[in-house]
A protein has these predicted regions:
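Secreted peptidase-domain scaffold signal
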Residues: 62-178
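Hydrolase catalytic cores
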Residues: 1-61
């Protein structure tokens, strides 16, 4: 817009974060052209930091306010734990997204296609889409959620799962070391 008399204007929000994340994503794909879009997206999500303030700029944001957090392309680009070396990535491809639409009963694909994917063991439940975030709607009782990670770390790297469960929920990760 036009800001008469002003030489500078600070702009923030989703309209600015989208082009910034797109640029960071392009740099990440340049560093790892062999990574799928899902792997690159998971690298951005799992290396984001969660020290994000809410809209009031005083209280800390919760996951519903900030999503995965604040993407952090800076710092040591090649350091372990950076977006270029996240350690683990989550893969999801065409079959996983087609199975997701089957599970939503949108009628986009034929029942035969959906049966084929089910026969391959590809889950159709939205909460089992192999992405870096987990969301379970209408949770009553217990629910098993499955994620598969792919190591992009140096050979011999070891990992330990750590979960900060929402208040009132118990979360167990099996195995928790790999």
């Amino acid at each position: 817009g036009d800001y008469p008399g002003q030489m500078f204007a600070a702009i923030a929000g989703t309209s600015m974060s989208s082009p910034q994340v797109a640029g960071i994503f392009a740099l990440l794909k340049q560093a790892h052209p062999e990574w799928s879009p899902a792997a690159a997206k998971s690298a951005l999500m799992t290396t984001a930091h969660q020290k994000v303030r809410d809209n009031d700029r005083v209280s800390m944001a919760d996951p519903f306010d900030m999503g995965a957090g604040h993407v952090n392309p800076g710092g040591l680009w090649d350091k372990r734990g950076s977006i270029v070396q996240p350690g683990l990535v989550y893969e999801a491809g065409l079959f996983e997204y087609v199975a997701l639409t089957c599970g939503q009963d949108w009628g986009i694909f034929t029942p035969g296609s959906c049966d084929f994917l089910e026969g391959l063991g590809i889950p159709s439940e939205a909460y089992n889409l192999n992405v870096a975030s987990i969301g379970v709607g209408q949770l009553a009782g217990s629910q098993t959620v499955v994620r598969t990670v792919t190591s992009v770390a140096d050979k011999g790297a070891k990992f330990r799962a750590k979960v900060e469960a929402p208040e009132g929920y118990d979360v167990t990760v099996t195995p928790n070391r790999f």
